[in-house]
Curated annotation (Swiss-Prot):
Protein name, entry field: Ubiquitin-conjugating enzyme E2 6
Taxonomy of the source species: Eukaryota, Fungi, Dikarya, Ascomycota, Saccharomycotina
Positions bearing Phosphothreonine: T178
Major location (coarse): endoplasmic reticulum
Catalytic-site annotation from UniProt: C87
Keyword Transmembrane belongs to the record: yes
Keyword ATP-binding: yes
Gene coding for it: UBC6
Top EC category: transferase
Positions carrying Phosphoserine: S139
Effect the entry attributes to changing C87S: Loss of activity
EC number from the UniProt entry: 2.3.2.23
Length: 250
């Protein structure tokens, strides 16, 4: 249970953070326990954490601000072990270096600075930039669908996340459709249904198609397979391909 002084100090700090939130940082106390704070760090643009959404906790002692909090990061991030106490100069690992004048904002700014550095410490891990970028992209989905505490503390952020994920899905779908529209004629032709040789009107194109069919049958025989009963049919991909080639050759 928080002392009167700790409660007063943390209430004041929360008010200050609401009025003047530090860049990339959102933090608030648990409504049922002012000693338990939750934060979200948004990955800065010039780092492998760009666009990432990193949730963690600050667990303050009852006699704060005279002793430092325990610091943890819950969202997988590639920099720290998830849900593990971190050894930082402003954490409970180093009460001897703690300054009572430091605040929640000071602590989280220090955590962000350490996160974007390469310095090792207890609770840190080493991963590639590619892994960090992958985790950054997956972080919103993780917090929204797998992180129970995140959903309880930041319900409005969860709603924003759902909208972000839906938009991302639509954008990716549009990109895939655009790719189909710009597909070259030969590739598109190869995906179409079959037609008969009789439907190929141009004599030269029909000859080419017949040659392709015979070659296909010969290959089947070499592989020990019987020609299919529908061997009089060829893929429209071949037909159109040959037709287009014929146009260029004429």
């Amino acid at each position: 249970m928080a002392t009167k002084q700790a409660h007063k100090r943390l209430t004041k700090e929360y008010k200050l953070m609401v009025e003047n939130p530090p860049p990339y940082i959102l933090a608030r106390p648990n409504e049922d326990n002012i000693l338990e704070w939750h934060y979200i760090i948004t990955g800065p643009a010039d780092t492998p954490y760009k666009g990432g959404q990193y949730h963690g906790t600050l667990t303050f002692p009852s006699d704060y601000p005279y002793k430092p909090p325990a610091i943890r990061m819950i969202t997988p991030n590639g920099r720290f072990k998830p849900n593990t106490r971190l050894c930082l100069s402003m954490s409970d690992y180093h009460p001897d270096t703690w300054n009572p004048g430091w605040s929640v904002s000071t602590i989280l700014n220090g955590l962000l600075s350490f996160m974007t550095s390469d310095e090792a410490t207890t609770g840190s891990i080493t991963t590639s930039d590619h892994q960090k970028k992958t985790l950054a992209r997956n972080s919103i989905s993780y917090n929204t669908f797998q992180n129970v505490r995140f959903k309880l503390i930041f319900p409005e952020v969860v709603q924003e996340n759902v909208e972000t994920l839906e938009k991302r899905k639509l954008d990716e779908g549009d990109a895939a459709n655009t790719g189909d529209e710009t597909e070259d004629p030969f590739t598109k032709a190869a995906k179409e249904k079959v037609i008969s040789l009789e439907e190929i009107l141009d004599p030269e194109d029909r000859i080419r198609a017949e040659q392709a069919l015979r070659q296909s049958e010969n290959n089947s025989k070499k592989d020990g397979k019987e020609p299919n009963d529908s061997s009089s049919m060829v893929y429209i991909g071949i037909a159109i391909f040959l037709f287009l080639v014929g146009l260029f050759m004429k």
